[in-house]
Structure formats: C-alpha cells, structure tokens
Amino acid sequence: MESWALTTPPIDIVNQYLFFIKRKTNYMATYYYALASQKFLLEEEPFEEVLKERRRDYGEKNKEIDFWQVIQPAFLNAPELAEAKAKAPEKNVAIVSTNKSFIVWVKLRLEYVLTGEFEAPSDAIPDPLASLD
C-alpha cells in the first residue's frame, strides 16, 4: 500500500510567495532602508555574509524574510526621496526591510550608511524592491 505524505515547501519558497502576494495585492507597507556605496557594502564590508547568516537564522525560526538587498534601488527616483538621492553615492546598494529595528542594527554595525523610510506600493514607488541595474 502506498503512503502519502504531505511535504512542506522550503521556508524560502513560502516567504517569496507571501511577499509576491503582498506586492500584487497593493498591500501598503513602510519600508526602511540603509544605503551605501556598492564598493563599501559589497567589497570592503562583506555584508553578504551577514545577510546569509540572518536568512539561515530566519529559516530555522520559520520567520518570514523581511529584508532584501537591492542594487541601484529604483525607489530613490521617487520625488519624496530626492534629498536622499542627492546624498547617495552614484553606484549604490540598499538593504531594505519592513523591520525598522533591523535597519537600526545595520546603521549601528556599519556606521557609514544613509538611512530612511518610504511607503510602498505607491504611484511613485510601485515596486519597493525594483532595481535600476
């Protein structure tokens, strides 16, 4: 006799699906960001390792991923973020999160980052994680 077992999809797939659904249903949320030069964040400060460790930790705790790395974030083109764009390095990368505490931690750990927040999706920022790259 065959046995049927229900399998649970990996947490990363579930998180991606949930985030996709939120984005497609115009779920308005506040996004916080830490912005730095690509050279600093991707080369001088190996921050990708920190993000990998954080993703692993979230997976073990079955927590929904609430942070993303966005190279050349499109949200900086929104009129309300003109001041941040003027201060941003030409080649930049953002750590974006719906968790303000995480961005505060990033700021404390890295120091040389610009932080801020925005609401999305909106007319000016239809996709909070869109990249110009």
From Swiss-Prot:
Pfam families documented for this protein: Ycf54 (PF10674)
Family label: Belongs to the ycf54 family.
Name of the protein in question: Ycf54-like protein
Species of origin: Synechocystis sp. (strain ATCC 27184 / PCC 6803 / Kazusa)
Lineage of the organism: Bacteria, Bacillati, Cyanobacteriota, Cyanophyceae, Synechococcales
